[in-house]
UniProtKB/Swiss-Prot annotation:
It comes from the Viruses. It is found in: Membrane. The keyword Magnesium does not apply. It comes from Invertebrate iridescent virus 3. GO terms for cellular component: membrane. This is Transmembrane protein 066L.
């Protein structure tokens, strides 16, 4: 496309280049008007390439895809084992769920250690447990955080005295149902006898 002026014929790309250079002299670079004019010039040049030379436009699209793919792989590689990944991981515990198991990973900033706990989905007990103390008050919210996912106190056998109670009554309902009273120094083994 050409434009006829008093001095002769100008092509559209020359007009856009003139407009771009002229706006750079008048408007501050980085301003809103400058950004709009530069965007229009780039869009028009892309349009010219795609319309008049489609094979060049296709090659530019492939080049853009390759550049984006390399940038993504570089970013993943930079973040996978670097200090940036450790900063992101330290903010909160991460729970990874695979098909057959779950893994909980968290960083302890006090001891400067990573803790990883892996457990299978089928191992988690779904039984309902209710704990009552010697005064028949419900103390389940106090004892429940100590139980662990298998509801066995992480393999330990604490006594009611270890937990600060004189006696505990346990009511269990689910796959295994029973009711039992544990005295002060009797180990809390949560399986039926």
């Amino acid at each position: 496309m050409t434009v006829t002026t008093a001095s002769g014929q100008w092509t559209f790309p020359v007009l856009f280049a003139t407009l771009l250079v002229g706006s750079a002299l008048v408007f501050p670079v980085g301003g809103l008007v400058w950004s709009a004019i530069a965007s229009l010039a780039i869009a028009y040049l892309y349009y010219l390439v795609v319309e008049q030379h489609p094979h060049v436009g296709f090659a530019l699209q492939l080049l853009a895809l390759v550049v984006v793919a390399r940038a993504k792989s570089w970013w993943r590689q930079a973040c996978s084992g670097s200090w940036l990944a450790s900063i992101v991981r330290r903010r909160k515990p991460t729970l990874t769920v695979d098909e057959y198991r779950s893994t909980l990973t968290y960083w302890d900033p006090v001891n400067k250690k990573w803790y990883i706990y892996t457990f299978a989905h089928g191992q988690r007990s779904t039984d309902l447990l209710i704990f009552r103390d010697e005064n028949k008050r419900d103390v389940t919210p106090l004892v429940e955080p100590l139980l662990g996912p298998l509801q066995n106190f992480h393999g330990a056998s604490p006594t009611p005295a270890d937990l600060g109670f004189a006696r505990l009554h346990v009511f269990r309902d689910g796959e295994t149902s029973y009711q039992r009273q544990f005295d002060r120094h009797e180990p809390l083994v949560l399986t039926p006898h």
